[in-house]
């Protein structure tokens, strides 16, 4: 990509404003609780902004455009599925989770299944979240490398510095404030770009003239089994993700938590559609382009320079903000559930620094991992991530919420372990299979259903 002076000026100005928000937020951070959940004082907009900052990352923008370039409308499953997941979370999960007054999903499971549940849930959730960080890191390195004409190592170093500016100083407050600004930029640039691409191709009728119905216009163009896996992975993964639940814990009350989820869904669902259309536009006019460069190339070459520069900044913020929010979730899990619960570190300042160092460590680990996967699909890592997150958490947590007191501790632990072990084993044996998540859910139910049925029968006697 060749940037003009106005591109660069607009990009730098936008990044400066958002990083300034992150540094300003750090003034409010005095303890680990402030860093993790913002002192539990966030309003609806801050909760929604914090969730949006994490979900609208490399997959929702660059990855969805890459999918649109490759197979069309089926790439919309990522943001559509995540939005449906947030609606379900708002309806059934937000209130009981916020009322618990806890900080992590693992703590919620420990109360019901005993202390052994904490490390199992934390490690499983962190493994799943890690692959989402991989996805956004992949997008970030390609994007920053293209903007600054840098190789892998310098681009990775820039990513680390930006993540530190986002979260290292401000925690959940930084993620929320930056999220609000970023969402505004995404809507102002991606939607304008999508509209211009749509009209340039002659609307739907014009698109149908140059693209066949299958696979380009079908949500099941990649196969019904893969589409259903993608949808259920997103729903299960969203509900099971520490980073999103952490935003609920930061809300001032349960009503605010539910409304924040609802607003986040309204933001997430439409974002993927213009990215898909831009992907198809670039496929039509530049079929030789590397698919992962689709969206940055469009913003640089098909929008006015001032808007294109802001759009590129929005993509950088989108990718890096997602890394920041997800890394914060992993850092919180490890600091609270491993160092706090297992290693008995209870000093608030020590936990704060452990959390910050974990954010940095996880970011570096993801950047090392992508070095050997630089040409892979962004969305594939996210769908795998969501499936792994839900494997040991979704149904056990759901059972506790809907069948309170009806799940035995041993059954809960076996369900968690069985789901995680079977999911990992299945993916290792059949790496391209779309059934990983369903295998995990089957093993969850294998232990949960008998326990719930037994306790329900005995409670009626």
List each model region and its residues.
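Membrane-embedded helix-loop-helix hairpins and adjacent transmembrane boundary segments
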Residues: 1-461
